[in-house]
Swiss-Prot record:
The active site is at H116 (pros-phosphohistidine intermediate). This is Nucleoside diphosphate kinase. One of its GO terms (biological process) is CTP biosynthetic process. Its EC number is 2.7.4.6. Homotetramer. ATP binds at K10, F58, R86, T92, R103, N113. It holds the Pfam family NDK. Keywords: ATP-binding, Cytoplasm, Kinase, Magnesium, Metal-binding, Nucleotide metabolism, Nucleotide-binding, Phosphoprotein, Transferase. NCBIfam families: PRK00668.1. GO terms for molecular function: ATP binding; metal ion binding; nucleoside diphosphate kinase activity. It is an enzyme of class 2 (transferase). It catalyses: a 2'-deoxyribonucleoside 5'-diphosphate + ATP = a 2'-deoxyribonucleoside 5'-triphosphate + ADP; a ribonucleoside 5'-diphosphate + ATP = a ribonucleoside 5'-triphosphate + ADP. The gene is ndk. Belongs to the NDK family.
Length: 138
């Protein structure tokens, strides 16, 4: 089934000029870029995007990290794109990352893990709509 999912290239990766490498990794794996924009989130936007985590101990540090530098929001499309991209991303936990995944290659820590990806079809729709209008997705 053809799906769309959201990829965020996080501040740790944008600051280290890894945008091109990460996008190449995704395209080489068969995902198509349908929309892309570089964004500087403010506190309110970051809190809104991660609202489901409000109240958790990692929420405030995550928001601070996400507003520390620009991010790149990308809509990816492909066969089973959500699961495919999550496999390419790798685990959040550094000890569980498989070699060759984006996070194994580029992450600095559990929080500074270079990329975000939608975890379900429902999340993908909500997250894509957070950054893109329908006519921005080509």
């Amino acid at each position: 089934m053809i799906q769309q999912t959201l990829c965020l290239i996080k501040p740790d990766a944008t600051q280290r000029n890894l945008i091109g490498k990460i996008l190449s990794h995704l395209e080489e794996a068969g995902l198509t870029i349908k929309a892309l924009k570089k964004v500087q989130l403010n506190q309110e936007q970051a809190e809104g995007f991660y609202a489901e985590h409000q109240g958790k101990e990692f929420f405030a540090p995550l928001v601070e990290f996400m507003i520390s530098a620009p991010i790149v929001a990308v809509v990816l499309e492909g066969e089973n794109a959500i699961a495919h991209y999550r496999e390419l991303m790798g685990a959040t936990n550094p000890e569980q990352r498989k070699a060759g995944t984006i996070r194994a290659l580029y992450a600095i820590s559990g929080r500074e893990n270079s990329v975000h990806g939608s975890d379900s079809e429902q999340s993908a729709k909500r997250e894509i709509a957070y950054f893109f209008t329908p006519n921005e997705i080509l």
